């Protein structure tokens, strides 16, 4: 899975976490079953642009906000395999 895919999946998990929402809730909003959402979160296959657009619309956030995870939450949502991402100011 690419760094962007990892960041997107982690961002979605983080957004659900801070909203106290479940994968089941998000899957129902997307008209998917939970197993399809789980596969997408694992990158098999990765989310496509239309799916990401729907997710950000459901959550009421921008794509940039989806990709924003506070540093102190990185380990929780990335584990030890934090993607090698360039940080810009």
PLM segments and residue spans:
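DNA major-groove recognition helix of helix-turn-helix
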Residues: 41, 51, 70
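Short, charged recognition helix plus adjacent turn
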Residues: 2, 67-89
